[in-house]
């Protein structure tokens, strides 16, 4: 997968290219991240990249010419078929479904805004899609861009040591992930659930599915509203709810 980034702070993306899963993917040649800085496309000695907005108001906007030239340079490097994405609070909110959709693209160009944003005409002429990572304000688009790169790279074949890791992540099937345990078996009087030590893979699968359903019901019940549960899932969720109610009653009596 090839990803181009338009940013005034390209050095921030070393967090993606030099570390962790994405860093290993870059070293293996599975992921390529290239950056273009609009400052490199300015024509004044101060390398100016911001200007005042028409109509007044607080803050500045990114200048059109350096930004457009940087986008055009990235497009030229990408060749045909690159999708240009602007990280924006006004964009579609990123979720796992969106990550899956974007991971199909082999070439992406991510535009990171700064200041109060970018000229609307640049959005109209250069941007294919706008995406947001949530309903809150950040200082720029770099962190959302890194979030996007990290999440979609997990779907690139070979990036993860075990592809099942991506397939079992939270939200992949519309549910939160189940609890996980490693050694020791007992930690401060808290034991690993016996079923995970049983070696019975069918029961382990059922336990994990039940916990995933239950955790979603407890923490993100709205996610269940859009799911058509199978008979097995419905039964397991009912079991979880009964067990949870019994536990609450027991704790209330203590």
UniProtKB/Swiss-Prot annotation:
Keywords: Cytoplasm, Methyltransferase, S-adenosyl-L-methionine, Transferase, tRNA processing. CDD domains: TrmD-like. SUPFAM superfamilies: alpha/beta knot. GO terms for molecular function: tRNA (guanine(37)-N1)-methyltransferase activity. Its EC number is 2.1.1.228. GO terms for cellular component: cytosol. Its main location: cytoplasm. Pfam families: tRNA_m1G_MT (PF01746). Gene3D superfamilies: 3.40.1280.10, tRNA(m1g37)methyltransferase, domain 2. It comes from the Bacteria. It is an enzyme of class 2 (transferase). InterPro entries: Alpha/beta_knot_MTases (IPR029028), tRNA_m1G_MeTrfase_C_sf (IPR023148), tRNA_m1G_MeTrfase_TrmD (IPR002649), tRNA_m1G_MTases_N (IPR029026), tRNA_MeTrfase_TRMD/TRM10 (IPR016009). It is found in: Cytoplasm. S-adenosyl-L-methionine binds at residues 113, 133-138. One of its GO terms (biological process) is tRNA N1-guanine methylation. It catalyses: guanosine(37) in tRNA + S-adenosyl-L-methionine = N(1)-methylguanosine(37) in tRNA + S-adenosyl-L-homocysteine + H(+). Specifically methylates guanosine-37 in various tRNAs. Belongs to the RNA methyltransferase TrmD family. Homodimer. This is tRNA (guanine-N(1)-)-methyltransferase.
């Amino acid at each position: 997968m090839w990803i181009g980034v338009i940013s005034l702070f390209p050095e921030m993306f070393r967090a993606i290219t030099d570390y962790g899963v994405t860093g290993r993917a870059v070293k293996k040649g599975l992921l390529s991240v290239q950056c273009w800085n609009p400052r490199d496309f300015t024509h004044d000695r101060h390398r100016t990249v911001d200007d005042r907005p028409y109509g007044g108001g607080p803050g500045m906007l990114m200048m059109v010419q350096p930004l457009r030239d940087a986008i055009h340079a990235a497009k030229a490097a990408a060749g045909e078929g690159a999708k240009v994405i602007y990280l924006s609070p006004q964009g579609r909110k990123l979720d796992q479904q969106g990550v899956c959709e974007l991971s199909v693209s082999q070439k992406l160009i991510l535009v990171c805004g700064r200041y109060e944003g970018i000229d609307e005409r640049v959005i109209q002429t250069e941007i294919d899609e706008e995406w947001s990572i949530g309903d809150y304000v950040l200082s720029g688009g770099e962190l959302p861009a890194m979030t996007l790169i990290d999440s979609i790279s997990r779907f690139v074949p070979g990036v993860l040591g075990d592809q099942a890791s991506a397939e079992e992540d939270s939200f992949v099937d519309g549910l939160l992930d189940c609890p996980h345990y490693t050694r020791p078996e007992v930690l401060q009087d808290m034991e690993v659930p016996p079923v995970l030590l049983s070696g019975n893979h069918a029961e382990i699968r059922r336990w994990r599915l039940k916990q995933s359903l239950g955790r979603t019901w407890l923490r993100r019940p709205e996610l269940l509203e859009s799911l058509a549960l199978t008979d097995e899932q419905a039964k397991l969720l009912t079991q979880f709810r009964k067990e949870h109610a019994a536990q609450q009653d027991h704790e209330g009596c203590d």
